Amino acid sequence: SKDAFDSYLFLDGKTKDNTTYPNTDVAVMESSKNDNLPHLNIQDLLKVRDKRLALTIDSVLCYGDGWPRIAGGQPMTSSSGYGICKYDNVAIDPNYRQQTSSNYTSAPLYWLAVIYLNYAEAKAELGTISNDDLNNTINLLKDRAGLPHITIDVADAGDNNMGVEPLIWEIRRERRCELMFDNDFRYWDLIRWHQLDKLDNSTNPDILLGANVVNDSSIDHEKSGDYLDGSTGRVRAFEAKHYLYPIPSGQITLNPKLEQNPLWKKN
């Protein structure tokens, strides 16, 4: 989504509202790749952001009838327009790159980055984190991303919508960007932070907005202004009970002493 895209900082370590880099989100129409099919390209937008973004999101937008990001391959499409390229290994046979049943790309089972992120977050939440801690964890990831280091006195970035201290917010941002699309980390993080309400598109109507497609005049549906709108015809409502799963009714039948989780009880 655009919200996820915009969570990645610019190379000066600032958000789109504060950066010294060009902060346009308008894609450029071109027809120079894969059989000269016209497509919107965001390569210039990726160049000025956190280096991880270009390794996560494809430089070509795909929507509508789709776009074959692999030459000769099947068209790919996305409700947000953003195509995923993370873990796509261009060195392997194209036939395997676009199959879900057999792909020879190595996938991590556990990340050193997760250890860094967990440690930094725990220390920050306890109020015991130091600049040395940041240099041994978060700032190592910043180096790889081509971003400036942060300190314990990091300034408010202006996009904090969780009501937490600026340092906690930046650690959460780092976690989001580093682990984007990985193993449902984001979903479970939002649960433990009690922030699932941010995904409710009835109260946050822009949360499912996608890419800026103003330069493609052929699109006449599923848009909100200049942006693709993935929420068209879809309602994603939040309820507090979603922080817990219900205990299966069969288990309660087996053990009547089990009590259903709060808010899942039938009247």
Language-model segment annotations:
Residues S1-A4:
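Extended substrate-binding grooves/exosites of carbohydrate-active enzymes
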Residues D6-N267:
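Acidic/polar-rich alpha-helix caps and helix-coil junctions
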